[in-house]
UniProtKB/Swiss-Prot annotation:
Na(+) binds at residues 167, 170, 173. It is an enzyme of class 3 (hydrolase). The lineage of its organism: Bacteria, Bacillati, Bacillota, Bacilli, Bacillales. Protease subunit of a proteasome-like degradation complex believed to be a general protein degrading machinery. Allosterically activated by HslU binding. Belongs to the peptidase T1B family. HslV subfamily. A double ring-shaped homohexamer of HslV is capped on each side by a ring-shaped HslU homohexamer. The assembly of the HslU/HslV complex is dependent on binding of ATP. Pfam families: Proteasome (PF00227). GO terms for cellular component: HslUV protease complex; proteasome core complex. This is ATP-dependent protease subunit HslV. It is found in: Cytoplasm. The gene is hslV.
Length: 182
């Protein structure tokens, strides 16, 4: 018997003018047909408020990864890059963890990283990342905003606007947007 999962979302993160911001929508979808929640929080502050982490994918899987990542942050005393690499190694090498269907974006005051279950830890050249069903729309909007209006907008404003664009296009992304800043 096939069991549907709770999933689909958009997470966008940007480093801009010395600040960091991460935005996520609030929609949780069950399977491909039913919106179960409109106001979910998919972004968390970790390690004494010094790290932001956002997830896209299956909710239960993402919570498992949040807990693991938080443990790695504690183990490596807040070293974001080391914690991310160690999580990715464990995620990829463990038979059970390898089946988790989620992705994470994590950031601190200096780094922005994508962590995937295939073992990738990627730091973007342009300081912008987006994941999830509306990720490509948010990424395009964020890049355009940073390139053409960046000197007039804050990181928080760009993150909010990029998610709004994604919510207008993607059926799995809503406009109940939560933005966190560092």
């Amino acid at each position: 018997m096939f069991m549907s999962q709770f999933h689909a979302t958009t997470i966008f993160a940007i480093r801009h003018q010395g600040k960091g911001a991460m935005a996520g929508d609030g929609q949780v979808t069950f399977g491909n047909a039913v919106v179960m929640k409109h106001t979910a929080r998919k972004i968390r502050k970790l390690f004494h408020g010094n790290v932001l982490a956002g997830f896209a994918g299956a909710v239960a899987d993402a919570f498992t990864l949040f807990e693991m990542f938080e443990g790695k942050l504690e183990e490596y005393n807040g070293n974001l890059q080391r914690a991310a690499v160690e999580l990715a190694k464990e995620w990829r090498s463990d038979k059970v963890l390898r089946r988790l269907e989620a992705m994470l974006i994590v950031m601190d005051a200096t780094h922005l990283l994508l962590i995937s279950g295939t073992g990738e830890v990627i730091e973007p050249d342009d300081g912008i990342l987006a994941i999830g069903s509306g990720g490509n729309y948010a990424l395009a909007a964020g890049r355009a905003l940073k390139a053409y209006a960046g000197e007039h907008l804050t990181a928080k404003q760009i993150a909010q606007a990029a998610l709004k664009v994604a919510s207008d296009i993607c059926v799995y992304t809503n406009d109940c947007i939560i933005v966190e800043e560092l």
